Amino acid sequence: LLRLHHRFGHRSFQDIQAWSRAGRFNIPIEVSTCKIPICLACKFGDAKKNPHNGATHSVGPANPNPGDFVSVDTLEAGIPGYIPFTNGKPSNRRYTNSTVWVDQASKNIWVDHQETKTGKETLQSKIRYEKYAARYHRELKHIHSDNGIFAKSEFVTHCQANNQTHTFCGVGAHWQNGVVERYIGHLTSRARTMLLHAMRHWPTMITPTFWPYAISHAARIHNHSPRRGQTKSPCELFTDETDSISPNDFHVFGCPVFVLAKELQDGKSMQKSSRARSYMGIYVGQSPHHASNVALIFNPKTQLVSPQYHVVFDEDVETVASSDPAIMESNIALISDQLFQDHEWIHTDDFT
């Protein structure tokens, strides 16, 4: 049960046991009666501030269709994060924040990471989200946001040009945009927990700089896993198509991965006998542009990320040294003090 919990992005034990009882995702029935274990990373990662005063109010139509009503907000990371470059030399460019979109009908999440919090980049996120929705014949009709960057003229003008209505929550009243706020809380909690788990086992390699990968991985697991009480995933509800990805396709975030050398992948012989037949990379999620069994692997030497199929996962992290308390404590302190500090609201709603 604990191993599945790690693989499914620290999904609640109760959800995993419910899937086991329902015979979903090839989870053995014995899992449904396991004693609930303790996950140390969850104990650290789920620590939050006190909830805001007052109730969380839902806005929008009672029974919307996908695209009818979407909420959007900005996630401030607090720590620069890796940009997934696929070629070239290591770069000092980093992501600093993300724009998060939540469709209220399906609870499907769209995340765009950004280098700057500018109107131009935020508008580009909106355009990309609209293209994604249009691919499945969904049209964004109403957008709900807070003020700030979403009140800029270019964003407002683009909404008007596309015949979209646009409403705002009150200044400082984040809970009036409660749907996206609580899902940002969900993503940051899961991402923080995955990072802490990975750093605990591999502190010399995993750092808070991996947060963009962790956020994207958390969103992808959410989108392709049924919510509590649902038989379809948020992705299936939004796209109205059978999901080609299941929780079984995911692996433990940040675990070591052995990638077959390119020559051997191409069916060629190794040019030099002294060269290794594989290299060790870091699992940072599944590729959104390939088959469900193609993983995204971060190469620590080149700092590049690539989709890989011929891989072996070390999900129990048995092939690397995991004992460096000083580095681990430093990273835990950095995550606790700086990462995702602007999004710690607790809502009583069930957002899983």
Language-model segments: residues:
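Retroelement integrase C-terminal DNA-binding domain
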Residues: 1-2, 6, 11-44, 49, ...
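Conserved, well-structured core segments
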Residues: 2-6, 40, 68-72, 81-90, ...
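Mobile genetic element proteins and their domesticated derivatives, centered on retroelements
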Residues: 4, 16-19, 39-42, 73, ...
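Beta-strand elements of modular eukaryotic interaction domains
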Residues: 28-30, 58-62, 83-92, 100, ...
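An active-site-proximal beta-strand-loop segment
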Residues: 44-115, 120-122, 266-270
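Active-site beta-loop-alpha junctions of metal-dependent nucleic acid enzymes
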Residues: 88-97, 111-137, 303-304, 311-319
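RNase H-like two-metal-ion nuclease catalytic core shared by retroviral integrases
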Residues: 145-161, 166-192, 206-219
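Acidic, glycine-rich loop-and-strand cores that form catalytic or ligand-binding grooves
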Residues: 218-264
